[in-house]
Structures are given as C-alpha cells and as structure tokens.
Amino acid sequence: MLRVLGIESSCDETAAAVVEGAEHGHPHGVVVRSNVVWSQLEVHALYGGVVPELASRAHIRHIQPVIEQALAEAGVRPQQLDAIAVTVAPGLVGALLVGVAAAQGLAVALDKPLVPVHHMEGHLMSPFLMAGVVPAMEFPFVALLVSGGHTLLLHARDFGDYQLLGQTRDDAVGEAFDKGARMLGLGYPGGPEVAALAQSGDRQAVAFPRVLLDRSQFDFSFSGLKTALRTHLLKFPPESGGPSLADVAASYQEAIVDTLVIKSLSACRHVGVSRLVIAGGVGANRRLREKLAKQALKQGVQLYAPPIHLCTDNGAMIASAGVCRLARGDQARGVVNAVPRLPIHELEKIYGR
C-alpha cells in the first residue's frame, strides 16, 4: 500500500490530502484518508477575479496549516508517508511555486520521493475517487474538463495515455461565465451567480448562438457568445421592456450548456467509447450535470459526474495521480520547477520524456 500526500496550489485553492493506493499503481482502490481545501474566494471576490499576487500570498499563509490539518485528519505522521505529490503545471506561476517549494522541502526533510503532477491529470482521477459507483469507472473514457482556465475534451485511453480531441479557441467556459456575470451586474465567481439567477428564468427567452456545432471537430469558442450577450443587453435592456435578467441569464447558461453537451457526446461517438467524465470547477454546474446526464442516458453513455468537492481543485486528485505516477517510477530526479503552461498531451515532459 502506497501512502501519498498531495499538494495543490495552482490557482486560488490551497489544498492537501492523504490517500492510500495499491502498489500496482491503478487508480482503482485509492482511498481518501483526508482532503483539506482552503478557498481564497473571499480574497478575490472584491476584484471580480483571481489576482495572482494575492493568490500567491494567501498560499504562503495557508499552505503549512493545510498540510498539517491533512496529516492530522488522516492520522498519519509525516514519516509514514511514502511520497509527496504536488501540482507543477499548469497554473499561476507564483501560486504553483508555493506548493512546489513546500513539497520539495518536505521531500528533502523526510527523504521521500517527490512526484510532480499535471493538474489536469489530477482532474482525470476524480471519478476513480467516487465510492460505490456502479458500474465502476474504467478506461477508456472521454473527459470534459471545464474550469476557469481550461475547456477541453480528452480521450483517456489509459492512465498516462491521453489524446486531445478539442479545446477552447478563446475563453475558457469559466471565463465566459465570469464575464457574462459581470455584464449582468452579478458578482464573482460568475458561474454560481449566473446559475442562481437562471433558476427563475426562461431558457428559451433569448436565442443566443451555439458556436462551432456545425463542424466535425471538437474545439470550443465562447467569444461570440459573450459578444451576443453584450449586444442583446444594449439593444434590449431589461429596464426598458426587454427580457428579464433572469431570462437572459438562463438563456446564456443554456447556450453554454448545450455547446458542452453536444460536443461531449459527439466526441464519445467519434472515438467509440461509452463512458464520459466531467470534471473541473464548472462541472459543479447543476444544469450542465442535469442535461448531460439526460442526454447521455438517451445515447447509451455512462456519465461519471464526481461530487462537487471532487470537481473543484483538491489535493486528493493530485495525491491519487501521485500514487499512479510513483508506481511507474515517475518521480523527480532533481530540482522541480513550476511550469505555468503545459498542455496535458505534453505532460510527459514533466518526467523528462
């Protein structure tokens, strides 16, 4: 049994977790012993988005207490760890460096292996951490990874074997929600704000575009949708008799959801798999999960939608990927650097390959 501490600090959550997994290194059977997350939401809400410098400072203040709490909740002494895993890419460079420095210090002090982990590979581990799911998660599958900084579709053929099917050409879906929320006069983060307002709105009130649906590839684009929202609000302001803000929010959210659902299920058909995973912060959107589940069922696709605490950034997913990487011998051979930009299909560069 491998016992791994995972550390995550790529953006605005300071997280650490302890997991245990089998030495064969398959994500099945990984048990989460603790999973501690300190959110910086209140730090950044005043600014309407993540401020990198403030994020780094908050990580510095909270990284050690979060690690100590994760160890305490797991009932594990540092010497009982087999390795320390840490997110090294991609993310805000200052934020990444805080986690990397903490992990390297621990690894040296304890004389334990340090395992670098790609953030998006961590998200791919989240469905394997769902207890009691029938049928159990297996490779291969298609993954829709959606967050403030990423929107992409992957064909995960096996652990470490990922084919990029499509990605956003401009804004990530989380950015589309944040910027849309700002236009609607809502707060940050935009996704939950838009979703809350949309609950009382008519999803068909405004005919917003679904972009790139008529093409065979799986890229996304949300810049045109944002422009359509801005144009609509200028032409038909709610205070002058236009559709209500709730109707506009519901229609805007539905356009985003439709695009993600149609592309994801089309990708499943394209590669011939019947398992679909959704992960990342936007994966917590209730309407997206609801519509994806309904359409997946119609098309004979099994949807794996992890609980919200596993969709958003957390240490358990990093520790789980760390177990698998450690079993493959993928550990640091020297000083580890933070890499702010690294596509998941190039993640082997982390391990010198």
From Swiss-Prot:
Highest taxon of source: Bacteria
Protein name, as recorded: tRNA N6-adenosine threonylcarbamoyltransferase
Disulfide bond residue pairs: none
CDD domains to which the protein is assigned, alphabetical: ASKHA_NBD_TsaD_bac
One GO term of the biological process aspect: tRNA threonylcarbamoyladenosine modification
Catalysed reactions listed for this entry: L-threonylcarbamoyladenylate + adenosine(37) in tRNA = N(6)-L-threonylcarbamoyladenosine(37) in tRNA + AMP + H(+)
Described purpose of this protein according to its UniProt entry: Required for the formation of a threonylcarbamoyl group on adenosine at position 37 (t(6)A37) in tRNAs that read codons beginning with adenine. Is involved in the transfer of the threonylcarbamoyl moiety of threonylcarbamoyl-AMP (TC-AMP) to the N6 group of A37, together with TsaE and TsaB. TsaD likely plays a direct catalytic role in this reaction.
Chain sites annotated for binding substrate: L145, V146, S147, G148, G149, D178, G191, N285
Cofactor: Fe(2+)
Pfam family, one: TsaD
Family classification: Belongs to the KAE1 / TsaD family.
Enzyme class: transferase
Note accompanying the cofactor annotation: Binds 1 Fe(2+) ion per subunit.
UniProt xrefs under NCBIfam families: gcp_kae1, T6A_TsaD_YgjD
Broad class of the protein's primary localization: cytoplasm
Organism of derivation: Magnetococcus marinus (strain ATCC BAA-1437 / JCM 17883 / MC-1)
